[in-house]
Amino acid sequence: MDSKKKSSTEAEGSKERGLVHVWQAGSFSLTPERLPGWGGKTVLQAALGVRHGVLLTEDGEVYSFGTLPWKSESAEICPSSPLLESALVGHHVITVATGSFHSGAVTESGVVYMWGENAAGQCAVANQQYVPEPSPVSISDSETSPSLAVRILQLACGEEHTLALSLSREIWAWGTGCQLGLITTTFPVTKPQKVEHLAGRVVLQVACGAFHSLALVQCLPPQDLKPVPERCNQCSQLLITMTDKEDHVIISDSHCCPLGVTLSESQAEKHASPAPSPHPEALDEQGEVFENTVVEAELNMGSSQTTSGSAISTQQNVVGTAEVSSARTAPSYPDTHAVTAYLQKLSEHSMRENHEPGEKPPQVQPLVEEAVPDLHSPPTTSTSALNSLVVSCASAVGVRVAATYEAGALSLKKVMNFYSTAPCETAAQSGSASTGPESLKDLREEQVKQESLQGKKSSSLMDIREEELEGGSRRLSLPGLLSQVSPRLLRKAARVKTRTVVLTPTYSGEADALLPSLRTEVWTWGKGKEGQLGHGDVLPRLQPLCVKCLDGKEVIHLEAGGSHSLALTAKSQVYSWGSNTFGQLGHSEFPTTVPRLSKVSSENGVWSVAAGQDYSLFLVDTEDFQPGLYYSGRQDRAEGDTLPENPSGTKTPVLLSCSKLGYISRVTAGKDSYLALVDKNIMGYIASLHELASTERRFYSKLSEIKSQILRPLLSLENLGTVTTVQLLQEVASRFSKLCYLIGQHGASLSSYLQGMKEASSLVIMKHSSLFLDSYTEYCTSVSNFLVMGGFQLLAKPAIDFLNKNQELLQDLSEVNDENTQLMEILNMLFFLPIRRLHNYAKVLLKLATCFEVTSPEYQKLQDSSSCYESLALHLGKKRKEAEYTLSFWKTFPGKMTDSLRKPERRLLCESSNRALSLQHAGRFSVNWFILFNDALVHAQFSTHHVFPLATLWAEPLSEEAGSVNGLKITTPEEQFTLISSTPQEKTKWLRAISQAVDQALRGTSDFPLYGGGSSVQRQEPPISRSAKYTFYKDTRLKDATYDGRWLSGKPHGRGVLKWPDGKMYSGMFRNGLEDGYGEYRIPNKALNKEDHYVGHWKEGKMCGQGVYSYASGEVFEGCFQDNMRHGHGLLRSGKLTSSSPSMFIGQWVMDKKAGYGVFDDITRGEKYMGMWQDDVCQGNGVVVTQFGLYYEGNFHLNKMMGNGVLLSEDDTIYEGEFSDDWTLSGKGTLTMPHGDYIEGYFSGEWGSGIKITGTYFKPSLYESDKDKPKAFRKLGNLAVAADEKWRAVFEECWRQLGCESPGQGEVWKAWDNIAVALTTNRRQHKDSPEILSRSQTQTLESLEYIPQHIGAFSVEKYDDIKKYLIKACDTPLHPLGRLVETLVAVYRMTYVGVGANRRLLQEAVKEIKSYLKRIFQLVRFLFPELPEEGSTIPLSAPLPTGRRSFCTGKSDSRSESPEPGYVVTSSGLLLPVLLPRLYPPLFMLYALDNDREEDIYWECVLRLNKQPDIALLGFLGVQKKFWPATLSILGESKKVLSTTKDACFASAVECLQQISTTFTPSDKLKVIQQTFEEISQSVLASLQEDFLWSMDDLFPVFLYVVLRARIRNLGSEVHLIEDLMDPFLQHGEQGIMFTTLKACYFQIQREKLN
């Protein structure tokens, strides 16, 4: 708090704010007094009751003064000085309120405290006359579960009730009376209840009179507005009925289910709301019945039907009657016949007046003087029944007879004059001589009665001209009472209707959140016998009802007096209604039941109001910005006054002399006194704030007047020029309206700001300056655009009549004094008028800044804001001049070109007619005119011109070496030309102008100053590299294509998108104008209604490198491209499994055709081809396997098996010989049967369908058969493609990526550079892809960017480093080696999975892996030249620790018996750990298929032998008894081995051997075997308790037992895999011997079955 207080009062001193002055009501000639006994704390708010008051100080304390009968201490009942309410100390109160005899306060935390009189429960305490001290009121919402405490923002108190406004903008009420708005019959209400009728609406403020309540409610947003229903919600009857008689139509809307139920005063507090009746009756004060009549019905404004020819007419003198529900009529009123006759006579009288020559029609005083229509209200009629209804006029008994707006011409004043003439006239007419207060009361009642005839449902009569102005297109039906229609009305009905344009500002979320809303409604309820509810009658209302005639009036504040109400609008006007006994309404001598404008001050607007018991106060802006206080209401008689005993009041509001007091910030009214809070103006701070607020409110009034008097009529004119101009004018109007609304909101917020703490830092104009700066900028831009397009000239013709008629108004509004100024000039100045306001903001903010220390943050902020507004004002002035300069240019420019070049936002910067500039090498007679606009450079020649957009224009001076001192080189995407200026100075000017224009075009912000300090820094020259959009018009390849992306010196360079008109699109990287780098390309295929789609690498405008091409036909190619063709390794998928011909090819491509080695999987035929290709056909050696087990290897020619080949069937039948077609034998050959018999000779025919044989049958001898059988199998693979010839393209691509033209030929450093580039590029591309790299992948990539350095002798450590690097490199496909491994794995799986899983292919698969190892090892040795060649030994840097005894020899040695200890370098040792785990599944499947028969025999034997318990099995296998375990340790317990024990002996060794199936590489499998032998040794040592040496005879049976118990399903496959792929140097070492033992066990188990 302290810091706040300090900053807000720094300029003033703390005792010069919130001074309290008190006047006695009725004696306004007296000077005010200071509040007796008040010390001088700054008062923020005061509230007055009948005989007491409450003060709220700046530090949140509350003081009471006056008569306080509820206090318990006698000394406190009439305190001599204000009394501190100690119960509230420490709670920090933010607002206070008083009723007649009670008070309330709201704390910072939203809690309500009440004290004072409580007879009616107004303090929310039950059964207690008085509440002496402030006590908290519990307000909780029972609708929530659990019920939540409700936080309160504002309080309002009446005589017997209190209203509270919650943080969620709902009203809570307690106390007694219908003014609570609650649906209840029991009073008092001591527990606060929600006013349900307004639940869900945003209530902005509440106010309480003695016995009535007001609420200011925010209008619903447009989308929430609903059309009025046709039928009543309660009783489902039609709201409007139409009765068709023979000669006339009667339209009645007498049905009324009022929201507020009408009750007589005596009943108001006794009854709950009765069921609404379709024919409501209103009871007057004595209980007599009279019928309500209504004058006006709103009709559908959009109706385009004319009823001139229809039968809707009405008999001239017919008046409908209705039954009166009571026999008695009020003696003080004329009867219904009298009224009817009077109305008829009066209308005839008005006709006569209208027909008199030379006389103006009578001026009608509107009830609500406002010419702007309700911009937010919904259509008030339903679409069906009402469209053809006629505007109706009231008869005296409540039935409407179709007529015209004649009732509008019927002057309300005359009706009033009839009942309210001077007392003598009244006496003469009524036959009564009474002239006292009773008579006046009667007159008021007559007045109220008469208004009720015209104000039912809160609608009112308006001046016919205002109606037409607002209604715009509202139609008049041809009336039936033609004889009564005035010529004026007929002329108006015949006039052609003009269009109306609604100037509704759009809902701006930001502004509406920060500033008070102007879209408001007023809702009232409670007692209404004085008309204080404003509904046009004197009936009470039990529930809130909207005062419709205040809709759209922008009410921002409400005040309620004893029995009158005030509404303050954003336009600084006050509407008042209710009792006017003492002239408290400020406008006439009579009361009014509908709101009317108060006539306070003709020159100045009202910005704050207060309503007392029977008077009103108005705080008014004055010329010197010091608020003036007007008083209107009760006037006490001066001494010796001998006037009659009638109440006295002011005729018009009286200005009180209070200028010497200071600046009044707030006024409060009670019963007999009123109070003002005053600020002294020490350093001009307060005066400056008042100046800002006052000028803002006046500015809003002026803008509103321009909007309603000028803009709206202009927009409704016909023939406003071209569509563009009309749109621009509408945009101007829309932006003007938005700005106007913002100013209105700001004016309203400043009014409430002046009543608060007045902190400089919370000024909206400074805190949220962008809101204002943006609105002004937008508005100025739209006006400038309108000006450039010649909008004001085009307006001249259609608007000339209107403007001439309103010339004085125009001059007055635009502040033009010179009478000779042209109309268009005035209009121009009027449209640019709002911009001047920015200077005022800057000036006032600067004034405010000078009130603070230069070092304070307030000074800095105010100073910055001031410079912001000033710089924008200057900038917008400059923009206006640019617009005028451009307009004058267009006037001189040749007409044909103007149409195509003239655009609203285009501004002229300079042109070559006044700055000599010519085209280099131009023809002698050619005319070249260069025009620089803010968005383009135009080159005009004779009647043609070319436009060069500035975003894609580069300008640079030619150097002197180029031979042109004054030359400028202009580069655009498709042109390049040189301009020669006359002088070096001209060259500099043009270069600077073009550079600045290009820079601004690229920024896209024009050159608006940056908010927050000065203008933006101007760059010397625009960037060479930039982003822009351009459509090509010349280039043959790119004609009509649009490019959007990065540019460099006139060419696409960097990321961009290129679109052709035919639908082709490229999105990706460009280099020097061509596609280069990574990109995506789409080509529509109209025939298939799909598109081809390529994603991948490009080079110099062509597909080049890795990519994926998806064809419209459904084919997908993944692989390498070169010059837009498939070239290199690639995979082509054709069709899907469900399509007609699914197939897959993976292999080498040359110039878009299959060539070299490839694998083709024909899924339909179930065949797979693995071999050589040429020109898209199988040509050369190859292998085919089928799903039925057939295997062919041999020659192919033109896709057919042709030449020598070998064919094997599933049952091992072999044919070796010549072929002529697929599976067709033709020529010499040998057919060998599975049992060894064979036929040699000539064969012809297709395999499987009968073969013709001419030859010799051989049956080999018994002894030869076993020996010769494998011969045929040994030849397998000879006619297949050699392993090293396979996948050459994959390896060549990898070498190319390393920068080598052929394997091993290149520089190592260059290879490493290429790896680094590949990693960086791929990482960058990965960032743009949707797949996000994990943290570990990112770390791997970072570690790969480090190149391993090896200096000195090669060691095991360096070897391990290389191994680690390879593992990481092969883990990421972003590395060339990783990509190679990924591709090899893909091709291997493609080859040997599915149909390729054929046991005949096992040896090919093993050879292929060995070939991979050899070729990858070559790559690794190229990258690491220090790595020794295959089979070399790396000496150990330190001998391995001894200790493990050699298993077989007993020697204490570390390794195998290699000649010297060391580490052998092999390709399999280095690369198999990386490669084999990835290839293991297909490879192991082939081993399993190949050993299928052996494995079945082995497994059957394993299952049989494992049925035996341990002891029996050990004995069966011949294990020596000394090795039998006697005891076993199970979970730490020693248990004896029994004869039934099973699966317990050597359990650790069994478990260890089972791990063999979980490893991949031979070396890992051998380690598992070695570990198993060690586990066996440990077990034996434990039982023998002594050292021993194994012999093979002892060891083999034990190991055989372990193998059996391990139950390894595919042991044969494991054995063969190790045998095929283990390092040769291991064969004769320790691991080799162990492996041989395992192999022997496998064969032994198979033979066990034979024993």
UniProtKB/Swiss-Prot annotation:
The modification N6-acetyllysine is found at K527. Residues 1507-1651 form the VPS9 domain. The modification Phosphothreonine is found at T504. Keywords: Acetylation, Guanine-nucleotide releasing factor, Phosphoprotein, Repeat. Residues 427-437, 450-461 have a biased composition (Polar residues). Pfam families: DH_alsin, MORN, PH_alsin, RCC1, VPS9. Residues 439-449 have a biased composition (Basic and acidic residues). It comes from the Eukaryota. GO terms for cellular component: centrosome; cytoplasm; cytosol; dendrite; dendritic spine; early endosome; glutamatergic synapse; growth cone. The keyword Signal does not apply. MORN repeats lie at residues 1043-1065, 1066-1088, 1094-1116, 1117-1139, 1145-1167, 1169-1191, 1192-1214, 1215-1238. GO terms for molecular function: GTPase activator activity; guanyl-nucleotide exchange factor activity; identical protein binding; protein homodimerization activity; protein serine/threonine kinase activator activity; small GTPase binding. RCC1 repeats lie at residues 59-108, 109-167, 169-218, 519-570, 572-621. Residues 895-1001 form the PH domain. SUPFAM superfamilies: DBL homology domain (DH-domain), Histone H3 K4-specific methyltransferase SET7/9 N-terminal domain, PH domain-like, RCC1/BLIP-II, VPS9 domain. The modification Phosphoserine is found at S459, S460, S477, S486, S1329. Residues 425-462 are annotated as: Disordered. The keyword Acetylation applies. May act as a GTPase regulator. Controls survival and growth of spinal motoneurons. Forms a heteromeric complex with ALS2CL. Interacts with ALS2CL. This is Alsin. It comes from Mus musculus (Mouse).
